[in-house]
C-alpha cells in the first residue's frame, strides 16, 4: 500500500507540466482565433467579394432584371453657361451631372462605413444607366488632372454617379423680337437603349434638381431663376423611352446692340438731316452728304445681318435698319426734289419765249397779207376814214413785254417753293422719325415683352 502511493504521486508530478503547457497552447490559439474573427475585412477583399469575379455580380444585367424598372434620380449643377450663338442656334454649358439609383446587388453589411467612394476605374465593374443628351451637338469629358468622375456606393445599395461634362446643345431660337427677345433653351436627358419597362428617369425632389454656380453671369443674357422641369417621353419604332428636360430662360441684354447698332444708325439718320440746312446751290455738298449717309447706313445694315442666321421672317433689328435706311434715302431724294423745283423757272421762261416767238411769227404772217408796198399798191390802200394808208403803218408790232422782269419774278417764286420744301423737311423728318421711335419701342419693349413673359 505504501509503495503504490508514491508511484501515483510520481506519475501526477510527471504529467502535470505537460498538461499545463497544453492548456496554455490551446488558450493562445483561442485568443488568436478570437482576434482574427473580430478584425474587419480589408477594402480590397471587400470589393472583390462585393463586385469581383467571385461575387457573381454581372455589370451587363440591370438591377431588378425582369422586374420593375430602375428609377434613376438626376440632378445638375451648372458650373458655367457659355456663349449662346445665334448663327448656329446652340449654347455651351459646363455641368456636373449626377445620377442616383438603387442596385440591391451592391448592398452590404460586412463593411463598417456607410458609404464607399470608389476609384472611377470601378465604373466598368458595375451597371450604369445609358443616359445621353438628346439635343447634344458636341460633348467632351474632363481628364485634368484625373478623370472628373465620382462613384459612391451606399450601404443600402444606392449608387451615386457624378461626372463633369462640357456640352454644346441645340437651342432653336425665335428671333422675331431680336435683340429684345427672350430665348428658351432646353436640355434633354434620355435613355438610349432601355425602354420605360426597364429604366425611368426623374428629377431630384428633395433638393433643387438644377443648381447654378453662385455669381454666374453671361455676356449678353440674364439667366432667369425660373427653370421649368418636365418630361419629354420619346416614342420611336423601337419602343417608348424615358426622357426628362429642363428649360432655361435667357433674357437678352441690349447694351451691346445699343452701342453697336442702334445709336450709330440713329446718328447717321440725324446726320442726313444736316443737308436741309445747307444752301440748295451747294449741290456737291448736299449730294455728297446724302450718298455718304446712304452708303454708311447700308454698311451698318449689312453688318447687323452678318451675325444672325438667314431666317425667313422679319426681325426687330431689320425693321429698325430698314426705316433708318429709308429716312437717309428720303433725305437724298428731298434734295433732288428741291433742286428740281428751284430750276423750274428756267423751263418756264424757255416755254414762254417759245410761245412768244410763235405768236410773233403768226402775227407777221397774218399782217403780211395786207402789206403790198413791194408791188406798188401801197397808195391804193385807204384807211377806214378814207385817207391813204402808209405802208409802214400796216405792220407795227407791239413792243415786247419785259421778259427779264417776268423771269426774275418766276425765278424768285420757284426758289421760294424750293426753300419751303427744305423748311418743311426740317420739321417733318425729325417729327416722323420721333413718331416711329415711340411706336417701335412701345411695341417691342412693352407690348411684345408682356406677351412673352405671359407665355413663359
From Swiss-Prot:
Which cysteines form disulfides? 171-185, 232-243
Question: Record's superkingdom?
Answer: Eukaryota
Record: glycosylation sites? 71
At which residues is there a site annotated Important for obstruction of the ion pore in the closed conformation?
A: 295
Q: Which Pfam families match?
A: Neur_chan_LBD, Neur_chan_memb
The record's annotation in CDD domains points to: LGIC_ECD_GlyR_alpha, LGIC_TM_GlyR_alpha
The name of this protein is Glycine receptor subunit alpha-4
Gene name linked to the record: Glra4
Amino acid at each position: 500500500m505504501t509503495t503504490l502511493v508514491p508511484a501515483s504521486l510520481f506519475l501526477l508530478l510527471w504529467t502535470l507540466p505537460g498538461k499545463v503547457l497544453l492548456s496554455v497552447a490551446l488558450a493562445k490559439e483561442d485568443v488568436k482565433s478570437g482576434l482574427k474573427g473580430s478584425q474587419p475585412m480589408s477594402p480590397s477583399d471587400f470589393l472583390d467579394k462585393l463586385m469581383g469575379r467571385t461575387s457573381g455580380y454581372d455589370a451587363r444585367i440591370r438591377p431588378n432584371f425582369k422586374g420593375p424598372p430602375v428609377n434613376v434620380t438626376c440632378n445638375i449643377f451648372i458650373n458655367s453657361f457659355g456663349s449662346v450663338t445665334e448663327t448656329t442656334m446652340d449654347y455651351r454649358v459646363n455641368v456636373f451631372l449626377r445620377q442616383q439609383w438603387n442596385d440591391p446587388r451592391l448592398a452590404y453589411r460586412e463593411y463598417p462605413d456607410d458609404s464607399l467612394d470608389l476609384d472611377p476605374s470601378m465604373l466598368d465593374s458595375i451597371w450604369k444607366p445609358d443616359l445621353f443628351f438628346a439635343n447634344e451637338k458636341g460633348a467632351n469629358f474632363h481628364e485634368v488632372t484625373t478623370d472628373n468622375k465620382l462613384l459612391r456606393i451606399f450601404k443600402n445599395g444606392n449608387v451615386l454617379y457624378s461626372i463633369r461634362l462640357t456640352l454644346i446643345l441645340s437651342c432653336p431660337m425665335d428671333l422675331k423680337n431680336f435683340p429684345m427677345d427672350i430665348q428658351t433653351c432646353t436640355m434633354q436627358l434620355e435613355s438610349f437603349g432601355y425602354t420605360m419597362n426597364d429604366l425611368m428617369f426623374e428629377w431630384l425632389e428633395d433638393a433643387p434638381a438644377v443648381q447654378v454656380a453662385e455669381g454666374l453671369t453671361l455676356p449678353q443674357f440674364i439667366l432667369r431663376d425660373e427653370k421649368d422641369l418636365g418630361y419629354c417621353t420619346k416614342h420611336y419604332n423601337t419602343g417608348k423611352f424615358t426622357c426628362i428636360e429642363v428649360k432655361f430662360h435667357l433674357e437678352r441684354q441690349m447694351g451691346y446692340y445699343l452701342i453697336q447698332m442702334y445709336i450709330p444708325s440713329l446718328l447717321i439718320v440725324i446726320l442726313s438731316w444736316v443737308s436741309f440746312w445747307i444752301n440748295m446751290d451747294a449741290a456737291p455738298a448736299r449730294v455728297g452728304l446724302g450718298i455718304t449717309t446712304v452708303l454708311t447706313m447700308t454698311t451698318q445694315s449689312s453688318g447687323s445681318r452678318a451675325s444672325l442666321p438667314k431666317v425667313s421672317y422679319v426681325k426687330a433689328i431689320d425693321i429698325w435698319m430698314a426705316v433708318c435706311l429709308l429716312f437717309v434715302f428720303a433725305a437724298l431724294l428731298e434734295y433732288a426734289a428741291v433742286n428740281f423745283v428751284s430750276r423750274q423757272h428756267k423751263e418756264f421762261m424757255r416755254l414762254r419765249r417759245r410761245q412768244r416767238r410763235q405768236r410773233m411769227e403768226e402775227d407777221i404772217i397774218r399782217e403780211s397779207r395786207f402789206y403790198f408796198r413791194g408791188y406798188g399798191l401801197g397808195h391804193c390802200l385807204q384807211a377806214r376814214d378814207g385817207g391813204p394808208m402808209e405802208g409802214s403803218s400796216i405792220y407795227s408790232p407791239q413792243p415786247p413785254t419785259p421778259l427779264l422782269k417776268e423771269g426774275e419774278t418766276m425765278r424768285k417764286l420757284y426758289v421760294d417753293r424750293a426753300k419751303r420744301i427744305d423748311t418743311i423737311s426740317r420739321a417733318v423728318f425729325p417729327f416722323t422719325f420721333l413718331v416711329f421711335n415711340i411706336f417701335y419701342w412701345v411695341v417691342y419693349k412693352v407690348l411684345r415683352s408682356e406677351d412673352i413673359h405671359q407665355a413663359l
